[in-house]
Amino acid sequence: MSATPSQRTVALAGLIGILGALLGGLGECALHYSASGSENAETYRFFVDLAPWRLSTGHFLSIFAIPLYFIGYWHLYERLKPAPQWARLTILLLGLYAFTLGDAWLGSRVYLAQLAQARAVAESAGDTVTIKLLSALLAQACFYNENILIGVRAGVLVISILYVVFVLRGKTSYPRWMAALNPILLVIAAFILYVAIPPIGGIFMPVAMNFAHVVFFSASTALTLRSTPAGQ
């Protein structure tokens, strides 16, 4: 039987999860943030004027940061005790699965950006043949890239449902109010903020999943630190 990890170890895992969500969000913001918001998002026009440093920084920062989510989900696995093992393990495995897909999605965004930028150059030159070719390639790349998000969102939705059920039943070490800080509800909050206050919400909307997990892991880690006995 494996030894039970100390509260300090669990808290450290939470801090690493926060770091992953924060750095992943900064990387994704570098890739996706546009002052025009989601205008023309379906054609990837926001990629056209993206500075090379933002493309490189956003790409590498996000793909190297997202795997830190795995440690954050181990933190959650431990914090959900004494919920049933099957529920905690399901949440852990779904977290690993969803954010493996998320990293694959983020890793291929750079190629969409390059296609969008190349098409813009062809448009400036009036090269209709190249425009047609690049538009077709961009549409195909969009199909293969964007559909990965279905798995990410479905995984996080199931995680959130299981989490809420067991927290509200008092089957975990969390207080019941923590049920409100589930990832899906926080993602929805980011979109509501975008609709209500676009200048502020426009910063959080492109990184809604990362924003949700910064808040989620931060609240969980703060509770862990508060409950950690001195010297443990």
Residue ranges, per PLM feature:
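Hydrophobic, aromatic-enriched alpha-helical segments typical of multi-pass transmembrane helices
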Residues: 2-232
